[in-house]
UniProtKB/Swiss-Prot annotation:
Gene name tied to this protein: rsmA
UniProt-annotated binding residues for S-adenosyl-L-methionine: N10, L12, G37, E58, D83, N117
Matches recorded under InterPro entries: KsgA/Erm, rRNA_Ade_diMease-like_C, rRNA_Ade_Mease_Trfase_CS, rRNA_Ade_methylase_Trfase_N, rRNA_adenine_dimethylase, SAM-dependent_MTases_sf
GO biological process terms held by the UniProt record: rRNA methylation
Molecular function terms from GO: 16S rRNA (adenine(1518)-N(6)/adenine(1519)-N(6))-dimethyltransferase activity; RNA binding; rRNA (adenine-N6,N6-)-dimethyltransferase activity
Keyword Cytoplasm: yes
Organism: Rhodopirellula baltica (strain DSM 10527 / NCIMB 13988 / SH1)
Official protein name in the record: Ribosomal RNA small subunit methyltransferase A
Broad class of enzyme this protein falls into: transferase
Key words, A-Z: Cytoplasm, Methyltransferase, RNA-binding, rRNA processing, S-adenosyl-L-methionine, Transferase
Length: 284
């Protein structure tokens, strides 16, 4: 078996760390787990003894067949062969439909989790987009590049602070569980990795009137993160809000001419995005 580089495959070969991922997720007997990147089924097998239902997705046909044999004893594990994403911003319909179906037949207090050693090349779209799916996850425990994990937990003024930091922290409590060196993977990646746990705070998420608008607008605001905030907002709102309306919003929120998006904290960004949304609605 050879890793396929286009799939971003780096297999975690330290069983103690595989067990740490499962343990960090605190999976209960009525919980539903989504795993992206089945691999040979090592993590899946551990979780199968803990979860009420598992949906595991593997893009590599050879690995899918190998894992199918490994997971055959577990009838509550459903496998899907193919790409988890329909495009960069959307999960495949059958994946979320399978999650909804599993949730409908398990107790009301069951949790939905993403637990996975994620392929590096899809980690950001997988985590970012899962947070505004139906149903949204309750917890995410994933192995990703260390740099990506640091971006998720970064604060204002940090070099790692950006759209991903805002999006994750607007909906989750985030922590880095463990930093992993390249030596615990095969083949060895060129960078360190991290096990990251995100506990989704549904109250925080529900306080955002339009999650999709929030996500898209935050990404636009940080596209040129070091530019002055006014020019960034004008660019992001082009054809949607005129300059006087934008200047009124920035003035009302107390953002001066030299303000930059990378200096604003989560509350300030949230207030700005909501003010822009309300102004757009008033324009309709």
């Amino acid at each position: 078996m050879r890793p396929v580089s286009k799939y971003g495959q780096n297999f975690l070969i330290d069983l103690n760390l595989v067990e740490l991922i499962a343990r960090s997720a605190e999976i209960g007997p009525s919980d539903i787990v989504l795993e992206i990147g089945t691999g040979v089924g090592s993590l899946t097998s551990i979780m199968a003894s803990q979860a009420g239902a598992i949906l595991t997705v593997e893009i590599d046909q050879n690995l899918f067949q190998l894992a199918s044999e490994e997971l055959a004893p577990f009838p509550h594990v459903k496998m899907i062969q193919g790409d988890a994403l329909k495009n960069k911003s959307t999960f495949r319909d059958d994946i979320m439909e399978s999650i909804r179906e599993a949730k409908s037949r398990l107790p009301d207090d069951s949790k939905f989790m993403l637990v996975a050693n994620l392929p590096y090349n899809v980690a950001t779209p997988i985590v970012s987009n899962l947070l505004h799916q139906d149903p949204p996850p309750d917890r995410i425990v994933v192995t990703i590049q260390k740099e990506l994990g640091e971006r998720m937990v970064a604060g204002p003024g940090s070099k790692d602070y950006g759209a991903l930091s805002i999006w994750i922290q607007a909906t989750c409590r985030a922590e880095i569980v463990r930093i992993l060196p390249p030596t615990v993977f095969w083949p060895r990646p060129k960078v360190d990795s991290a096990i990251v746990r995100l506990d989704v705070d549904h109250e925080r998420g529900n306080a955002i009137p339009d999650l999709k608008y929030f996500h898209q607008t935050v990404r636009a605001l940080f596209f040129h993160r070091r530019k002055f905030l006014r020019s960034v907002v004008i660019s992001a709102m082009k054809g949607r809000l005129d300059k006087p309306a934008i200047d009124e919003i920035l003035g009302r929120l107390g953002h001066g001419e030299t303000a930059r998006a990378e200096e604003l904290n989560l509350e300030q960004i949230s207030d700005l995005v909501e003010a822009l949304r309300q102004a757009e609605l008033a324009n309709e």
